[in-house]
Amino acid sequence: MAQSTLYSRVLGTGSYLPPDRVTNQELADRLAKDGIETSDEWIVARTGIRARHFAAPDVTTSDLALVAAQRAIEAADVDPQSIDLIIVATSTPDFVFPSTACLLQNKLGIKNGGAAFDVQAVCSGFAYALATADSFIRTGQHRTALVIGAEAFSRILDFKDRTTCVLFGDGAGAVVLSASEEPGILGSALHADGSYSNILCTPGNVNRGVIAGSAFLHMDGQAVFKLAVNVLEKVAVEALSKAELASEQVDWLIPHQANIRIMTSTCRKLGLPQERMIVTVDEHGNTSAASIPLALDVAVRDGRIKRGQHVLIEGVGGGFTWGASVFRF
């Protein structure tokens, strides 16, 4: 008897945004107190962002991840103790170590000894984490995975740099994957080029009890834009090829929610109508690894994404890293 193909399938999604919603005007007013000039019009014209959410000082990345995880587990209708793999994509972990995934496992009360670890690929992190979990499930090493993108990016923003501090926000998104004979994740592609590490980075590190280097995010916006629009189309086409799908078979595109101009450019290059692109950057800002699963959950819960539809996700981030996955929801 021929052995059936094993897939990893999305059973449920969840997300969380901290309650402090900050509009462009509110942020501009805060910055003006330090002599930093910006405006709602300037931010919207360049990015499409109108608001973002910031976590309170005592709220950690694992706190954000916990709520998103609980909502995804509830939507998936699974026993938390059946989750034998937790992967958290984050660039803003609670600690140097242990991993945010281990902290989350404990907060969820999961005591089964399953694997838990973090993935750090910045804004591509969720694409990396999803593909990693898919590989573990397809090979039979794990059966049920909790995959999360979570960030408290406000912790590493320099609020004296108007070119970066207006872009980012905090939040978390999660999915529960489970082994299935029914097609789920159909193809993924991951890439990196470390020679571009300096164009988007937070170059500080802990050295003998002090921060060595800068603890704030640094970005060459023009270089990032140029590289992003070049690689996103290519990695999306590669993932579709592995899935044996044409772009016209994609029901929904969920790009990393960084900049509306990058997003619309990629959508256009793929030949997809703009109406098929999920957009949350206007309300969420750039939440790094959380942006894709946040947008996914929003579109699932508002009824746009339906069972049986093909969803293409793609991200690009510091490293430089980029990745894409296509799945049947």
UniProtKB/Swiss-Prot annotation:
It comes from the Bacteria. GO terms for molecular function: 3-oxoacyl-[acyl-carrier-protein] synthase activity; beta-ketoacyl-acyl-carrier-protein synthase III activity. CDD domains: KAS_III. The active site is at C123, H256, N286. It is found in: Cytoplasm. The keyword Membrane does not apply. Pfam families: ACP_syn_III (PF08545), ACP_syn_III_C (PF08541). It is an enzyme of class 2 (transferase). PANTHER family: 3-OXOACYL-[ACYL-CARRIER-PROTEIN] SYNTHASE (PTHR43091), BETA-KETOACYL-[ACYL-CARRIER-PROTEIN] SYNTHASE III, CHLOROPLASTIC (PTHR43091:SF1). Belongs to the thiolase-like superfamily. FabH family. The last Arg residue of the ACP-binding site is essential for the weak association between ACP/AcpP and FabH. Catalyzes the condensation reaction of fatty acid synthesis by the addition to an acyl acceptor of two carbons from malonyl-ACP. Catalyzes the first condensation reaction which initiates fatty acid synthesis and may therefore play a role in governing the total rate of fatty acid production. Possesses both acetoacetyl-ACP synthase and acetyl transacylase activities. Its substrate specificity determines the biosynthesis of branched-chain and/or straight-chain of fatty acids. This is Beta-ketoacyl-[acyl-carrier-protein] synthase III. The lineage of its organism: Bacteria, Pseudomonadati, Pseudomonadota, Betaproteobacteria, Burkholderiales. The gene is fabH.
